[in-house]
């Protein structure tokens, strides 16, 4: 079983923000699959199931994502190598998609929470959102909406990311890196 987690913040006002790119990928994946809702308030997530895949959007807000993912991981006894986390990355230019296992949180509070609750060795799908011109403006930047131009490009980036996630279930991460990394 795979647990595919999109990081983001709940609420309509955050729907198309840079910080919610993980949620956007999960939403698009769910559109193309037959899914059923898993109702369990202990999971603190919107959780969908399709075959041997679980798709989670933690409802704890970004900074406590690890609490939600930990409860799902423990309940379903999912190994870390079968957890795929999709998140925004300030250190990558907009539209870049990269993959890795483990590593630091790079100041990302969602990853920081995950690392402290489940460990670090899960699969990370990093989607570049670019950086603000002023370093002091990071919080406002990640919580701002994508521009129209970015949203137009994002559709293809999300489709590409979904194909990569499907490949991650059957291929070695190095194969996925060489085939699906977008720069």
Curated annotation (Swiss-Prot):
TRNA binds at residues 14, 61, 63, 109. Keywords: Cytoplasm, Hydrolase, RNA-binding, tRNA-binding. It catalyses: an N-acyl-L-alpha-aminoacyl-tRNA + H2O = an N-acyl-L-amino acid + a tRNA + H(+). One of its GO terms (molecular function) is peptidyl-tRNA hydrolase activity. One of its GO terms (cellular component) is cytoplasm. The record marks 88 as: Stabilizes the basic form of H active site to accept a proton. The active site is at residue 19. Its main location: cytoplasm. The record marks 9 as: Discriminates between blocked and unblocked aminoacyl-tRNA. Its EC number is 3.1.1.29. One of its GO terms (biological process) is protein quality control for misfolded or incompletely synthesized proteins. It is found in: Cytoplasm. InterPro entries: Pept_tRNA_hydro (IPR001328), Pept_tRNA_hydro_CS (IPR018171), Pept_tRNA_hydro_sf (IPR036416). Monomer. Belongs to the PTH family. NCBIfam families: pth (TIGR00447). Hydrolyzes ribosome-free peptidyl-tRNAs (with 1 or more amino acids incorporated), which drop off the ribosome during protein synthesis, or as a result of ribosome stalling. Catalyzes the release of premature peptidyl moieties from peptidyl-tRNA molecules trapped in stalled 50S ribosomal subunits, and thus maintains levels of free tRNAs and 50S ribosomes. This is Peptidyl-tRNA hydrolase. It comes from Aliarcobacter butzleri (strain RM4018).
């Amino acid at each position: 079983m795979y647990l595919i987690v999109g990081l983001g913040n709940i609420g309509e006002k955050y729907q198309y923000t840079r910080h919610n790119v993980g949620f956007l990928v999960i939403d698009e994946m769910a559109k193309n699959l037959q899914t059923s809702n898993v109702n369990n308030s202990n999971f603190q997530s919107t959780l969908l199931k399709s075959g041997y895949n679980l798709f989670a959007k933690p409802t704890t807000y970004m900074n406590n994502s690890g609490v939600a993912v930990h409860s799902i991981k423990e309940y379903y006894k999912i190994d870390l190598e079968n957890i795929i986390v999709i998140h925004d990355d300030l250190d990558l230019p907009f539209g870049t998609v990269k993959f890795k296992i483990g590593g630091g949180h790079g100041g990302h509070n969602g990853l920081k929470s995950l690392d402290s609750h489940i460990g670090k060795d899960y699969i990370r799908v990093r989607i570049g959102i670019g950086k603000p011109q002023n370093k002091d403006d990071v919080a406002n930047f990640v919580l701002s909406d994508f521009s129209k131009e970015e949203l137009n490009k994002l559709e293809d980036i999300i489709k590409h990311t979904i194909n990569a996630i499907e490949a991650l279930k059957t291929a070695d991460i190095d194969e996925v890196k060489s085939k699906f990394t977008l720069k």
